[in-house]
Amino acid sequence: NESQLTSQLIQQIIDGKFIALISDAGTPLINDPGYKLVTAAYYNRIKVIPIPGPSAVITALSASGLPTNRFIFEGYLSAKKEARKKFLQQLISESRTLVFFEAPHRILETIQDMQDVFGSERRVTIARELTKKYEQIVLDTLSAVNKKLINEEIKIKGEFVVIVEGAQETSVSDVEVLRVNQILSEKLSPKVAAGLTSKITGKKKNEVYQMALKASKK
């Protein structure tokens, strides 16, 4: 098993051997097993030397046409539709660019689920067969990409990187925050009202509480 093999490899390094951790394609440990071996190496005071190489995540991002200053990588989504949509719903308000891997036999369903959850106009970049002869990278809306997959403008072959535009950040004005807090304060204690207002508006609880105190003194 993984723990036993990790121990064996660590012992071989301690005994003077050199171990290289590689993958079939791309950069090792990016959506691949093996991080426990690296962790064990650090715990045993063994030097870890990374060798830069190609990564589908970074390669696709660099050519995506979407913001690259802030992004999150979520690997493969669940193969089960209900679990997949539930997970996507947790990312509705995520403002960072979203990066996923997807298999060809699930790509159409995944794009359709993303369209249902994020809306048809959210932009997405589909990248497949990266660095290969039939590489294809397409930037469009989720609804347009869905159609292009159906009519095979985007070929459903090879592994896919799916990059989704983050949600637009919206800021709630102080006036709106105070209004929400005032309504809640009619039935709840100041601290409870501030806590709920924080969850509704995204404003920090302490800031809401202080704003309410100042408003009450005017």
Set out the residue ranges of the language-model regions.
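Conserved RecA-like P-loop NTPase ATPase core
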Residues: L21, F73, A103
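Short gly/pro/ser/thr-enriched loop/turn and capping motifs at secondary-structure boundaries
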Residues: P28, S55-I58, K132-K133
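Class I SAM-dependent methyltransferase SAM-binding "motif I" and its flanking Rossmann-like core
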Residues: K36-E94
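A contiguous loop/helix-start segment that scaffolds small-molecule binding in enzyme catalytic cores
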Residues: I14-F18, T97, P104-K218
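Short hydrophobic/charged patches on amphipathic alpha-helices used for structural packing
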Residues: S7-I10, L88-Q89, Q182
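General beta-strand structural signal in soluble alpha/beta enzymes
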Residues: S23, P50-G53, F100, I126
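Helical mechanochemical/support elements of P-loop NTPase systems and associated helical scaffolds
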Residues: L5, G26, P33, A56, ...
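Class I S-adenosyl-L-methionine
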Residues: N1-P50
